[in-house]
Amino acid sequence: MKALVYTKPNELVYRDEPDPAPGEGQVLIKVEASGICGSDMHAYHGHDPRRVPPLILGHEVAGTVASGKSKGERVAINPLMTCGICAYCESGRTNLCTARELIGMRVSGAYCEYVSIAERNLVPIPDSLNLVTASLAEPAACSLHALNKARMHSARPLSELRAMVIGGGAIGMLSALLLTSYGCRHVTVAETNGLRR
């Protein structure tokens, strides 16, 4: 398959890589769309020691199932791989699994033609949702998680509050959009980067 491989700081090489071989409980996904996360940019610039080259980056992804019983289904991928058996996983708090790994961090990510991932990490998407939009499911989930935490700890509904989102990147803007969809009428986005203002 073709892949965009991070080979050293400030260098990506488009080259042939072996097709991933799905393990037990995994399926092969044909990547149709992949977002560029700010963390991928940090890695590209050499500011993330956890991402050791050579590595295929990318964890915001949507595509089509290419193997298994769901072959042909359109999906977004939850890029967080977990053990599935610890107390955190069994209670639905997979983000706290101590064995968690993120695709594109230490294992191959989605800047390629195919990625293998556990079938439990697939999120079916309707035909009405385009795959580029679906690839934003992961950053949208991060925003929604923060918003749900705020709702849980607030004594008043969001529609009665003023909100400030610090940072106008993708997650910040998604957070602002979600806040307004929850009825928050006073949302301010604070951003120091002049290119984003």
Per-segment meaning from a language model:
Residues 2, 26-28, 161-162:
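Residues that mark the start of a beta-strand
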